[in-house]
Amino acid sequence: EINTDNISAKDEFKEIKYILQKINDYVFQSPIGVMYNVELITEYIRNRVIYEGENYRNATLTLVRSKLNQNFVIVNDEYWRCYTWIDGKTYETTSDPEVFYEAGKAVGKFQHLLEGFHTRCLTDNIKNFHNTPYRYETFRDVVKIDDLDRASECKKEIEFIKKRANKMSVITDALAEKRIPRRVVHNDTKQIGRASC
């Protein structure tokens, strides 16, 4: 989780909103690597959007740079970053076909805009985060140990996962065999109900 605060500033003409975030350096042990990735990806997308003649303002996040022109600051050994504000909303579930449509549109647009982006330039900030076979093995170990005695409360869910164990490596196998390309992933929807950023 990233700790977030909303802030705003006024000039003589309008109020400008920002989102100030403390990067959780327990989860993201290399905040510098995270910000390196964010900057590479957002700049690549911004340049593609401009090249395609579209409005770039809400097409990607806009980092607010420090006085030293950095994309983050360190205060009391904590890493902070700032973006211009984009109104947002997260959907945990939905039955609205428009929300499904916009989610698919966002994923497709994101992948389109990152066409040609070289993922080997990125840093791997959470080791094995998308390594589903590794995640499944960890899951099995935790269920087996059950040191908090909770497995009995979720037998149905555990069986659901176990029945799908043979599918856990479909993507990692395809990546290893170069049948599919390695891609950048990130999912984010905004309050306007349309894929925007």
Annotate each language-model stretch with its function.
Residues 1-16, 20, 63, 166-196:
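Active-site acidic catalytic loop and adjacent metal/ATP-binding pocket
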Residues 21, 28-33, 86-106, 116-186:
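ATP-dependent phospho-/nucleotidyl transfer catalytic cores
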